[in-house]
Swiss-Prot record:
Protein name according to UniProt: Probable dual-specificity RNA methyltransferase RlmN
Gene: rlmN
BP-aspect Gene Ontology terms: rRNA base methylation; tRNA methylation
Protein's organism: Prochlorococcus marinus (strain SARG / CCMP1375 / SS120)
Domain Radical SAM core: 101-335
Disulphide bridges: 108-340
Length: 348
């Protein structure tokens, strides 16, 4: 294993054992590395005091590091949601969010710095894409939130900054690590996508290759029930018609055996009319899937409106009358710009 600038987070037990052997140490040293990385959550190699100091120094001199992130700011919302601003090794900023609810802790992780998709209602894409995150940077977000709450996460959702399907291999590598090394069940992990042409079959095939079986949830951010409206909200939809997108969802189901859930942001007087609910039911009714509604969370510089509770309730009841299983996601962390659609890598 080439040692130049290796980040240890994301490496599994066999890879860490191989690293130890490659450096003249025993398999046992690799197991110790694994334990201290994933059970104790160390930030620096020097903190792994069970390893010989000479070997620790040798690893550091060869450019090997844990590969964690540095917390540069923390925002605590009134509902106890915590947003962390985390600095990468090259000085970029990632936002990640911890959402407590009873005995559960959901961590919302980012997969990219910025986003190229340009969704009109989302703050993340306002500055475009800077780069995609590496597996260590994704896994490190989980450790940072775990440390902030002093408790282990129950769920991880890829709903932070970026489009996960434009970073498929690193996202799947991180899911593999979260599952096998941190012990987070795949069924407690959700990957959200706005839809990227030609990636759903690739996701299914690579997920089977990386994970052996696909148990995580794929959530499709639909946000509009027809092509014209969707294109006005999501520029990338111009190259990916809803009909083809839903065909790919069915193909994904055939390949993985896992149903796709649908997400729909409600924008006041724009996509929240009864006829929109009826159109949405027509689109997704055959999937026997869950629809997760999200009331718009305001961002600077946009004139979209959050719908009234009455309009939200009418939309929900319309879907339910059509036999659609639907839920409304609570807007957590709204007062600290930590809610869905509000993350942005610029607030220091």
């Amino acid at each position: 294993m080439e040692s130049h600038k290796i980040q240890l987070l994301g490496l599994d037990l066999s890879q860490l054992e191989r690293l130890a052997l490659d450096h003249g140490e025993s398999l046992y040293r690799g197991r110790q590395l694994h334990q201290w990385l994933y059970q104790k959550g160390v930030d620096n190699l020097d903190d792994i005091t069970v390893l010989p100091k000479a070997w620790r120094n040798s690893l550091i001199q060869k450019g090997i590091s844990v590969g964690g992130l540095v917390e540069v700011n923390r925002f605590i919302a009134g509902d106890r949601t915590i947003k962390l601003l985390l600095s990468t090794g090259d000085g970029e900023i990632i936002e990640t969010v911890g959402i407590p609810s009873g005995n559960r802790l959901t961590i919302c992780v980012s997969s990219q710095i910025g986003c190229p998709m340009g969704c009109q209602f989302c703050a993340t894409g306002k500055d475009g894409l800077k780069r995609s995150l590496k597996v260590n940077e994704i896994v490190a977000q989980v450790f940072a939130v775990k440390k902030a709450f002093n408790r282990s996460p129950s769920n991880v959702v890829f709903m932070g900054m970026g489009e996960p399907l434009l970073n498929i291999e690193e996202v799947l590598s991180s899911i593999c690590c979260l599952n096998k090394d941190l012990g987070i069940g795949q069924r407690r992990i959700t990957v959200s996508t706005v839809g990227v042409k030609n990636t759903l079959p690739q996701l299914a095939e690579l997920a089977l290759q990386f994970l052996g079986s696909v148990q995580f949830t794929l959530a499709l951010s639909l946000h509009a029930p027809n092509q014209k409206l969707r294109e006005s909200l999501i520029p990338s939809a111009q190259n990916y018609p809803i009909k083809l997108l839903l065909e790919d969802c069915r193909h994904y189901l055939d390949l993985t055996g896992r149903r796709v859930s649908f997400e729909y942001i409600l924008l006041g007087h724009l996509n929240d009319h009864i006829e929109h609910a009826e159109e949405l039911a027509d689109l997704v009714g055959g999937f026997q899937s869950h629809v997760n509604l999200i009331a718009y969370n305001p961002i600077d510089g946009e004139s979209f409106q959050r719908p009234s509770n009455q309009r939200v309730n009418i939309f929900i009841k319309t879907l339910q009358k059509r036999g659609i299983v639907v839920s409304l996601r609570a807007s957590r962390g709204l007062d600290k710009n930590a809610a869905c659609g509000q993350l942005r890598s610029m607030n220091m």
